[in-house]
Swiss-Prot record:
One of its GO terms (molecular function) is structural constituent of ribosome. Keywords: Ribonucleoprotein, Ribosomal protein, RNA-binding, rRNA-binding. Belongs to the universal ribosomal protein uL24 family. The gene is rplX. The keyword rRNA-binding applies. PANTHER family: MITOCHONDRIAL RIBOSOMAL PROTEIN L24. This is Large ribosomal subunit protein uL24. One of two assembly initiator proteins, it binds directly to the 5'-end of the 23S rRNA, where it nucleates assembly of the 50S subunit. CDD domains: KOW_RPL26 (cd06089). The keyword Ribosomal protein applies. HAMAP family: Ribosomal_uL24_B.
Amino acid sequence: MKVHKGDTVLVISGKDKGAKGKVLVAYPDRNKVLVEGVNRIKKHTAVSANERGASSGGIVTQEAPIHVSNVMVVDSDGKPTRVGYRIDDETGKKVRIAKTNGKDI
């Protein structure tokens, strides 16, 4: 999967189209990412008492995972880009590059 934790991404389709956010968690086995402030849902939790006796529960708003095909990585210029790879000459490791300007991500 070409999107990693910490990347800034732009949502390109869906109800949050045009929103930018930071990837909080990547789920490569499910091809999904959790983006900060995007795809917010209301989750209804049962009321329960915690160890101090205070009750917690009700309606909680939180982010839900979004499919990786609905986001694009934003390059250093702030434009959405596809992601490519190149082999680093010094270390021999794969490095992600932006297809728009060729710079490292």
